[in-house]
């Protein structure tokens, strides 16, 4: 993995709001992404991340990519100066990334889940859990449907808190309906290619017609051979 600064993933202390409960409006496109709603494509299929995984080609690709990332060796480096780096033997972050990101998942399960979110829905999100010192001690994957990304200026945080206008904040809605706002330093976010600098483009949205056609063809073939 890429080299990291002296304090890997350390939280910034200046001008950063603590994780706080929030409320606010969202566009229809936000809710559409939030709940995974899929519009019917020309084949008549409704393509969502769940329905796309019923298409054998999609399932095979997601499984292959997730397995490759999950089996890749993980090393943590500390950056020395501007051009040198040093392998961080025994750094606690290495165990988080390599062995157990959280108490509910092995690293294999975590990375397969993270990659599936990224390739299907366009974004992989994981909340970074920290000790009081700011050191990262855990990673929890978040369903992209439950995450909305904002620039600081969109929420008025640049005026209220004095943070950079283009700093990212993540509104996460949990199963109990509560929503919390997280600073970009408390979120691991790997997006697909995108257009706004905040979120990656959903593969399902971009390739919906092709996936829908594949689903329809498989269903048609299955009905033919069942008769």
Predicted regions and their residues:
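Structured, contiguous alpha/beta core segments that scaffold functional sites
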Residues: 2-227
């Amino acid at each position: 993995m890429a080299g990291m600064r002296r304090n890997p993933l350390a939280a910034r202390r200046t001008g950063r709001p603590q994780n706080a409960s929030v409320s606010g409006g969202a566009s229809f496109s936000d809710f559409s992404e939030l709940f995974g709603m899929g519009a019917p494509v020309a084949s008549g299929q409704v393509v969502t991340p769940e329905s796309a995984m019923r298409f054998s080609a999609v399932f095979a690709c997601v499984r292959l990519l997730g397995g490759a990332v999950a089996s890749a060796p993980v090393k943590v480096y500390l950056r020395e100066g501007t051009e040198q780096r040093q392998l961080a033997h025994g750094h606690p972050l290495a165990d988080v990334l390599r062995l157990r990101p959280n108490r509910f998942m092995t690293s294999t399960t975590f990375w397969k889940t993270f990659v599936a979110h990224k390739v299907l829905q366009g974004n992989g999100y994981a909340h970074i859990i920290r000790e009081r010192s700011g050191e990262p001690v855990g990673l929890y994957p978040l369903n992209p449907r439950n995450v909305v990304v904002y620039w600081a200026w969109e929420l008025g945080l640049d005026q209220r808190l004095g943070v950079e206008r283009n700093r990212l904040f993540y509104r996460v809605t949990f199963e109990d309906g509560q929503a919390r706002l997280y600073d970009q330093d408390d979120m691991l976010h790997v997006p697909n290619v995108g257009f706004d600098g905040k979120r990656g483009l959903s593969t399902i949205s971009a390739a919906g017609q092709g996936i829908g056609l594949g689903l329809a063809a498989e269903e048609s073939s299955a009905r033919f051979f069942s008769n």
